Amino acid sequence: MAARLCCHLDSARDVLLLRPFGPQSSGPSFPRPAAGSAASSASSPSPSDESDLPLGRLPACFASASGPCCLVFTCADLRTMDSTVNFVSWHANRQLGMPSKDLWTPYIKDQLLTKWEEGSIDPRLSIFVLGGCRHKCMRLL
């Protein structure tokens, strides 16, 4: 089942923080799994992460040349959470005229994060529905 998460840029650490979105979204982030849990080592946090785990990583497929897994990143406008758009399709429409998909990573790192810092980011990028991706996570920048 997919989880609805809210994204925030932590400019001090240059990472995206993915927090639960819902009636109590101001509560703590995802708790760390217990030491004896059956979770795979690829999905469990490193010991250096705090107990209030900010999921400051995105799946490695997010910055791949072919784009993220289609079922992983879904954008939704905060005002109309019922109508979601596929992030890959949304991004493809935004990058029309770009010469190649090799610009995917520079676009995310330069354009998207700059807009985020300036506060002029499209509200559809504020919420992602994540689920089903088994790629390892990476740290942006």
From Swiss-Prot:
Bias (Low complexity) ranges: 25-48
Pfam families assigned: X
InterPro entries attached to this UniProt entry: Transactivation_prot_X
GO biological process terms held by the UniProt record: DNA-templated transcription; symbiont-mediated activation of host NF-kappaB cascade; symbiont-mediated arrest of host cell cycle during G2/M transition; viral genome replication
Signal peptide start and end residues: none
Subcellular localization: Host cytoplasm; Host nucleus; Host mitochondrion
Functional note: Multifunctional protein that plays a role in silencing host antiviral defenses and promoting viral transcription. Does not seem to be essential for HBV infection. May be directly involved in development of cirrhosis and liver cancer (hepatocellular carcinoma). Most of cytosolic activities involve modulation of cytosolic calcium. The effect on apoptosis is controversial depending on the cell types in which the studies have been conducted. May induce apoptosis by localizing in mitochondria and causing loss of mitochondrial membrane potential.
Identification of the protein by name: Protein X
Organism: Woodchuck hepatitis B virus (isolate 8)
Encoding gene per record: X
